Amino acid sequence: MYLVMEIQKNGDQVSNLVYSYANRNEAESKYYSILSVAALSTVEQHAVTLLTDQGNCIMSRFYVHKAEE
């Protein structure tokens, strides 16, 4: 089993979503789907991690978006 964990933080609000998949291909598809949205997001902080069910991190990415001046 593989887990995809998504964390969003905007001001004082935090959202944490966890998805589980039976195979790695489906999990990686979800991981990259979240990344494509996170790259363009206006949420202050956006993270996504792909883990095994034993807790081993396969890949992880974290975006910090700052307000444009």
Show which residues each predicted segment covers.
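A short, exposed loop/beta-hairpin motif centered on an aromatic-Gly-Thr core
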Residues: Q13-S29
